[in-house]
Structure formats: structure tokens, C-alpha cells
Design a protein with these regions (language model features):
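Positions that flank functional sites
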Residues: 54, 93-94
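DNA major-groove recognition helix of helix-turn-helix/homeodomain DNA-binding modules
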Residues: 73-89
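Short basic helix-loop element that most often maps to the first helix and adjoining turn
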Residues: 33-50, 77
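The DNA-recognition helices of helix-turn-helix-type DNA-binding domains
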Residues: 66-67, 82, 93
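N-terminal flexible/basic segments that precede or flank functional cores
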Residues: 1-33, 95-100
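Recognition helix of helix-turn-helix/homeodomain-like DNA-binding domains
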Residues: 53-69
Length: 100
């Protein structure tokens, strides 16, 4: 884990309220951005993820691009490759969690 990531994790571990705020902000990011962040947290390059997915590296770059609207199946497949899940959460559940 790099210096900033380590420092952020230590802060989030020490301050649960900050961890919740961080999670809420992360959830508001576009899915391609979340995917790119998680790929980097898993220490995978786009090339390494492409190899896992058996696609060319530019396909991963397009999936992660803010200017591209990837298919949900591509997002789900890439998310599983970085050990993540894509969830649909009802607004009322999100509101309940926000007040926790």
C-alpha cells in the first residue's frame, strides 16, 4: 500500500464517522470511476486486468473512461475480476444508512 493509501486507511480505521462519509462519497462516483479506483487499490494495471478478462487493454481503458458509457455487463465483469460487486440500492435504504 502506498503512503497516501496507507494514511487514508489509518484515518478511516481510527474514525468510523469519516469512514462512513468516505463510503457515501465513493458510492456517488460514476461506476467506471469506482472500478478504476478499485483496480488500483487491488494493485492491478489496466493490462493485468485486461489479461484476467481476456480482452485488449484498450477495452479496459474504455470501460474506465468518463467519456465512455460502458455496458453494465462490462462493468459487472470487470468488478468481479477485481473482487467487487455492483449493487442496486433502493433510495430509502440509502437514506436510512445516511442517517446512521
Amino acid at each position: 500500500m502506498r503512503g497516501f493509501d496507507r494514511h487514508l486507511q489509518e484515518l478511516l480505521d481510527a474514525h468510523p464517522e469519516a469512514a462512513m462519509a468516505h463510503a457515501k462519497l465513493f458510492a456517488e462516483l460514476p461506476l467506471p470511476t469506482q472500478l478504476a479506483i478499485m483496480r488500483r487499490r487491488r494493485k492491478l494495471s489496466q493490462r493485468a486486468l485486461a489479461k484476467k478478462l481476456r480482452v485488449p487493454q484498450p477495452a479496459v481503458a474504455r470501460t474506465e473512461s468518463a467519456s465512455h458509457d460502458p455496458r453494465i455487463s462490462s462493468i459487472i465483469r470487470a468488478a468481479h475480476a477485481v473482487r467487487c460487486h455492483v449493487l442496486v440500492v433502493p433510495d430509502e435504504e440509502l437514506a436510512r444508512l445516511a442517517h446512521t
